[in-house]
Amino acid sequence: MSVCTKCGNPNVIITRKQSGQSLCADCFIKSVDKKVQQTIRREKLLNKGDKVMVALSGGKDSVVTLDIINSYRERHVIDLCAVTIDEGIKGYRNEGVDIAISHAKRLGIEHKVVSFKDCFGIDLDEIMKTDNHRGSCTYCGVFRRWIINRTAREFGADKIATGHNLDDESQAVLMNYLEGNINNLSSLGALTTSKSPKFTPKIKPLREIPEKEVGLYALAKGLDIHLAGCPYAQESFRMEVGNILKDLTKDHPTMMYSVIKGYDKLKPLVKENYPPEFHQGDCAICGEPSSNELCRVCTFLKELGHRVQL
């Protein structure tokens, strides 16, 4: 019977294939906290006095991000706030919103719930009933980023923290490479910034934590999380890439780490030759940064017969 490598506790909750480490709940929590703190320190994700807005869906990744970053708030290093987006998916979104509200109240932080309906005059359920929609994920990603960035400015946030984990990041690296999206590759990483003052820098504290460990961390700490999957989730190229990586990881446990470590070494060269797209103008309707007359949000809304509710 295995015992905790760190303290000898026989109640082991995980054995890491990549290192052979067996850990009890307490030592596992400490190891994840330490790994995230190392990422924050090495990548300079937080500065003293920062106001950080967490994109809080109520799912495991965002709840764990909030929980770990809150330790910096408790030490008076940063100020913390959160935004939760209600896409308007009946029978699914309400639970996640309620969980997010509960966590924000528990920590006593500023929190806003912003809906697609209030911002755009139409929610995702209504969009999916139209005949000419582009697919749920297309709208959801673009609309969510618009709301997150705009709300960060309203909060006066210096950073936006998202719950992207190791699986997410390694998928993004491989997916963009396979599709030849080199400009997109240059905008990945633990910290992403923009030349536009209207874009708030984004940080990914969980970037080196596997998805499985994020879920186990939430369970070990007794954190309430939204477990349901989105009813609009569909098989996508990202999912295919994710499945490939998971299959490779079975025999090569360090594969996902290798993907992002290799990417981090190449990033300076990629960024130098393929800089991220800079939106030099502003959208004629909503005023958000855009290279064209209309940003993607306003373009999509125009197709749907709606416009941003300013």
Predicted ranges, named:
Residues M1, I13-Q18, P268-H279, I285-S290:
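Short, flexible, mixed-charge glycine/proline-rich loop motifs
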Residues S22-S31, S258-P268:
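Short, structured interface segments
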Residues H133, D167-K250, M255, L310:
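Catalytic subdomain that performs nucleotidyl-dependent activation
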Residues P231-E235, K261-K265, P276-H279:
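Small/polar glycine-rich anion-binding or flexible loop at a beta-alpha turn
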